[in-house]
Amino acid sequence: MLAYALHLRAKPKCVLLFGLFVYLLADLSSAAEFRVGLVLDRGGKDDKSFNSSAYQGAMDAKQKLGVFVKYVEASDDNAFEPLIRSFAQKDFDLIIGIGFAQKEAIGKVARQFPKRQFAIIDAQIDEPNVRSLLFEEHEGAYLVGAIAALTSKTGKIGFVGGMDIPLIRRFAMGYEAGAKAINPQITVLANYAGVTSEAWNNPPKGKELALSQYDSGADIVFAAAGASGLGVFDAAEERKKFVIGVDANQDWMKPGLVLTSMLKRVDQAVFSIIEEARNGKFSGGVKRFGLANKGIDYSVDEFNAKILTESVRTRAESIKAEIVSGKIKVPDFYKKQ
């Protein structure tokens, strides 16, 4: 009887010890979890373009690789450094800056936290703990420019850029070169939403510029303008003209009016650097994404299959192959400066 009583009195302690063991094990598991901090640019995760693609890549990594992901959206350019620093101070394993505007902030914080791992999209930072993820946007722009010229009935097409900077000029130059390779007489109208970071998040301005181009005779407009591009899509719907999307596959947004999207696989870049870092294979340096490794491409799906004709697709595939082989040399604004 006494032994039984002692057993009953001892049981709660066993339960408590077991519970403590489980708690400590869970805590250790949480501490061992690979943590990713994602700093989005001004357009935010709902821009349906550049930032949305980056966010999707991180969410894919969360689901497929089991990493922890926390994302933040910058309210203005001054917010980048504090957000990046906060992730570094909280011992996040990998911190990713989305967009060239974060170059200075990522570089500064990376130097102050040399044991942390960083990555940045669209900028090159020469630090051993920073991976620079760069894209050959001019290749994709050339390709969709050719597609636009092959499709246009008016001999006039348009381009609406976001912030007037070398990166977007690179899109514009490639687009015009691709179009004129098909039709040397084609007219390419080009406008930009502004010269400050506000230009990425101004749909009304994007719509105004696109309407002006459509009303001037353009029957296709390529939008490379972040969230401002949403206004270009609205203009296309209003005028019943074609639009070309950018970064993410935007064909679904206005079915039957989106001729194609120039795919800039930011999602692929974000996923790949998270996977490398999680597997202990992170290194600094530069990784480039272009047509050759499918980091750049154009879209074909159920939303544009009927308007992107088979003959145009066949020609586009031929042009793509010639760019990859080097037979076609695409002009690069970065090298023209």
Question: What spans do the regions from the language model cover?
Answer:
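Short amphipathic alpha-helical "recognition" segments used for binding
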Residues: 5, 15-17, 251
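A residue-level marker of the well-folded mature domains of exported/periplasmic proteins
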Residues: 32-337
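Bacterial N-terminal signal peptides
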Residues: 13-27
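Hydrophobic alpha-helical segments, especially transmembrane helices
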Residues: 10-14, 321
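N-terminal secretory signal peptides that target proteins for export/translocation
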Residues: 1-10
